């Protein structure tokens, strides 16, 4: 079982949060696991702990960094080995022109600050959705939506550029044309071995394309991560449903750090960051405000799930084609 979900008493969670300036950690467990698969070979305290951070980014990059740093430091204090930050953790601008103006290359000052933070805290960081000026910036004058994974030494171990750009018109939420200022990525990133398990990288809108999650799972992913900035209309309708579906069909943990609240006068995000286990249970979640939630990753439970429900062995590529392996 996930240690912070059922085994520690609620009083312990309250003690862990004492003195925390941001809203209290929220942990949710709503559905029991099947009895035959509920026991782990490890005690809960031996399982790796991850932290999912929820923030309200603004156009002020340094204020955003300060908020994220406080959450990462708190996650470190609580014993997390890996902290997940949402899409646009660096900033959310008022318009495309400001987005381009505030963007930086991966070797810029801002990512250097996060690298130092990871190194000082001794924690891995999933930085989902960095506004990156790529090597083709001078030619395209467009950026990449880049998910960066830092190890505990502050080194970049993987970077994935969002492949599915969000060009949509949602009634009541307003139009979005990410492709007006963003270039699509050209490849998926192979899953990366971390202290919590093998992590497959994706970003927000990617969760609507199950082929991506299946391909990452086939490549060895045990954890899929979807840092996001869902809106106030699509969030209540689709957010949890999509994340649970991706977890069930891929038989992976799904970790989704989210933006929340009002960023400026024209944009707000849904929040509700969460962790979903391979059974499809929401095992940890935040509410609507800034803060973090914690979960323990039980890879023994994941392997049990895959043995009891061997769906990848039952696939019929002769009927509907096969997914090409990651290069």
From Swiss-Prot:
CDD domains: nit
Stretch forming the transit peptide: 1-36
Active site: 87, 162, 204
The reaction(s) this protein catalyses: N-(4-oxoglutaryl)-L-cysteinylglycine + H2O = L-cysteinylglycine + 2-oxoglutarate
Domain of life: Eukaryota
Domain CN hydrolase: 47-299
GO MF term set: deaminated glutathione amidase activity
SUPFAM superfamilies registered for this protein in UniProt: Carbon-nitrogen hydrolase (SSF56317)
GO cellular component annotations of the record: cytoplasm; mitochondrion
EC code: 3.5.1.128
Uppermost EC category: hydrolase
Keywords, in A-Z order: Cytoplasm, Hydrolase, Mitochondrion, Transit peptide
GO terms of biological process kind: amide catabolic process
Purpose of the protein: Catalyzes the hydrolysis of the amide bond in N-(4-oxoglutarate)-L-cysteinylglycine (deaminated glutathione), a metabolite repair reaction to dispose of the harmful deaminated glutathione. Plays a role in cell growth and apoptosis: loss of expression promotes cell growth, resistance to DNA damage stress and increased incidence to NMBA-induced tumors. Has tumor suppressor properties that enhances the apoptotic responsiveness in cancer cells; this effect is additive to the tumor suppressor activity of FHIT. It is also a negative regulator of primary T-cells.
Note: According to Rosetta Stone theory, the existence of a fusion protein in one genome predicts that the separate polypeptides expressed in other organisms function in the same cellular or biochemical pathway. In Drosophila melanogaster and Caenorhabditis elegans, NitFhit is a fusion protein composed of a C-terminal Fhit domain and a domain related to plant and bacterial nitrilase.
UniProt similarity note: Belongs to the carbon-nitrogen hydrolase superfamily. NIT1/NIT2 family.
Name the UniProt record assigns to this protein: Deaminated glutathione amidase
Organism listed in the record: Rattus norvegicus
């Amino acid at each position: 079982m996930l240690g912070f979900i059922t085994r520690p008493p609620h009083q312990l969670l309250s003690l862990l949060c004492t003195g925390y300036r941001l809203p209290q950690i929220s942990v949710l467990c709503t559905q029991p696991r099947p009895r035959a698969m509920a026991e782990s070979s490890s005690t809960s305290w031996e399982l790796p702990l991850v932290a999912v951070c929820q923030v309200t980014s603004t156009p002020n990059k340094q204020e955003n960094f300060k908020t994220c740093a406080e959450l990462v430091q708190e996650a470190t204090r609580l014993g997390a080995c890996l902290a997940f930050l949402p899409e646009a953790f660096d900033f959310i601008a008022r318009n495309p022109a400001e987005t381009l103006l505030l963007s930086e290359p991966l070797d810029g000052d801002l990512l250097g600050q996060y690298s130092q933070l990871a190194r000082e805290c001794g924690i891995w960081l999933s930085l989902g959705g960095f506004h990156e000026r790529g090597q083709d910036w001078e030619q395209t004058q467009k950026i990449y939506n880049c998910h960066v994974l830092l190890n505990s030494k502050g080194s970049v171990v993987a970077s994935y550029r969002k492949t599915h750009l969000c060009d949509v018109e949602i009634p009541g939420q307003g139009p979005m044309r990410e492709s007006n200022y963003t270039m699509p990525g050209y490849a998926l990133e192979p899953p990366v071995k971390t202290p919590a398990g093998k992590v497959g990288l994706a970003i927000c809108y990617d969760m609507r394309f199950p082929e991506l999650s299946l391909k990452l799972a086939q490549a060895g992913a045990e954890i899929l991560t979807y840092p996001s900035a869902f809106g106030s209309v699509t969030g209540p309708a689709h957010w949890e449903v999509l994340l649970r579906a991706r977890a069930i069909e891929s038989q992976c943990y799904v970790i989704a750090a989210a933006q929340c609240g009002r960023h400026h006068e024209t944009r707000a995000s849904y929040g509700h960051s969460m962790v979903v286990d391979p059974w499809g249970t929401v095992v940890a979640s935040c509410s609507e405000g800034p803060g973090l939630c914690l979960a323990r990753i039980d890879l023994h439970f994941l392997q049990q799930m895959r043995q009891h429900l061997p769906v990848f062995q039952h696939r019929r590529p002769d009927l509907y084609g096969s997914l090409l392996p990651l290069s």
